[in-house]
A protein has these predicted regions:
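Structured adenosyl-cofactor binding patch, chiefly the S-adenosyl-L-methionine
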Residues: 32-36, 46-58, 72, 117-156
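Short glycine-rich anion-binding loops that position phosphate/pyrophosphate groups of nucleotides
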Residues: 19, 90-92, 110-113, 133
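RNA substrate-binding interface of SAM-dependent RNA methyltransferases
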Residues: 2-93
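Structural alpha-helical scaffold elements that stabilize or flank donor/cofactor-binding regions
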Residues: 99-100, 119
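Low-acidity, Ser/Thr- and Arg-rich intrinsically disordered low-complexity segments
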Residues: 154-165, 169-174
Length: 174
């Protein structure tokens, strides 16, 4: 999987996500934004009928990758030039105020419990979506859509800058 990726690539590491409706919504969003979905070793998460129905065709368009144990997976992703970002409710960098890298793995935690603390600590950075405070957070599927759209906006901004200067990067000129 890693060898076939271009210079810009986005992946979602789903840590503990278990609700098939959220999984289906995440698959549809991942398909829309061209992200791969990484499933941890030992995760019972799999494509069910309910997830496929919610994904509405998105499941067939997404690369699903079953990861090796976390330490191995993190090492391989970093060697491939990925930065890992833990998505957290509080205490992270403001998603809308940071520059996102071209190769990014967003680690999305379980509904309610969040992600494994050791996995969050192993990430290169922590990102949060600022909100009004009326609710504690978005659910994992809604948060995934916000994170992926922000990364896509970074990518679109890069294309616009290249066009404005008369240069079009080969990776975006397809």
């Amino acid at each position: 999987w890693l060898h076939g990726l271009g210079p810009a690539a986005l992946a979602l590491w789903l840590d503990g996500v278990g609700n098939p409706h959220n999984f289906g919504a995440i698959l549809r969003t991942a398909a829309h934004f061209g992200a791969s979905v990484l499933l941890p070793a030992g995760s019972p998460l799999a494509l069910s009928g309910a997830a496929a129905r919610v994904a509405e065709g998105g499941a067939e368009a997404v690369t699903l990758v079953r990861l090796p144990p976390s330490v191995e997976a993190i090492d391989a992703l970093r060697r491939a030039g990925f930065q890992l970002a833990a998505t957290v409710v509080r205490g992270g960098e403001d998603l809308f105020a940071v520059e996102l890298p071209a190769r990014l793995v967003l680690v999305m935690g379980a509904e309610g419990e969040g992600m494994d603390a050791a996995l969050a600590a192993a990430c290169d950075r922590r990102l949060s979506i600022p909100g009004s405070g009326a609710v504690e957070s978005l659910n994992v599927a809604a948060a995934t859509a916000v994170f992926l759209s922000r990364w896509a906006a970074r990518k679109a901004s890069t294309r616009s800058s290249s066009r404005a200067s008369g240069l079009i990067s080969r990776s975006w000129a397809r």
